[in-house]
Amino acid sequence: MKDLENMALLIDFYGALLTPRQQELMQAYYLEDLSLAEIAGEGGVSRQAVHDLIKRSEASLHEYEAKLGFVREYRQRQQTLALLEAALAEGDLVRARAAVEELKAE
C-alpha cells in the first residue's frame, strides 16, 4: 500500500510533466487499478509495451522527485502538522510553538 500511496503522490505532484500518453497509462494503472492486460486491450498495444511505458514513467517521476523534492517536503509538513495537532490536543504549548516555528522555517 505504501508504494501505491507514494506513486499516487508522485503522480499528483509531477504527473503534468509526463506526456499525455504517460499520464493516461499511469492514471489507468495506479489510480483506476486496471491491469496491464486491460490497459493494453483498451489501447490496442501489447502488454509489454504498456509495462515498458509505465516503468519509464515511474523512472521519470522518481527523477523529478530526486531533483525537486516536493513530495518529501509535503510529507515533512504533514508530519509537523500532526505533531502540532497532537501538542494542541494535549495542551502542550511549548511543543505546539516549536511545531509552528518549524513550519514557518520551511
Question: Across the structure, where does each feature detected by a protein language model lie?
Answer:
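Short amphipathic alpha-helical boundary/capping segments
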Residues: 9-18
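Short amphipathic alpha helix immediately N-terminal
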Residues: 20-32
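Hydrophobic positions on the alpha-helical face of helix-turn-helix-like DNA-binding modules
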Residues: 25, 39-40, 50
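Helix-turn-helix DNA-binding motif, specifically the short coil turn and the N-cap/start of the second
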Residues: 46-47
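Residues within the DNA-recognition helix of helix-turn-helix
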Residues: 53-56
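C-terminal flanking helix
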Residues: 58-65
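Short, basic, alpha-helical segments at the C-terminal edge of helix-turn-helix-like DNA-binding modules
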Residues: 67-79
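Helix-turn-helix/homeodomain-like alpha-helical modules used for DNA recognition
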Residues: 79-106
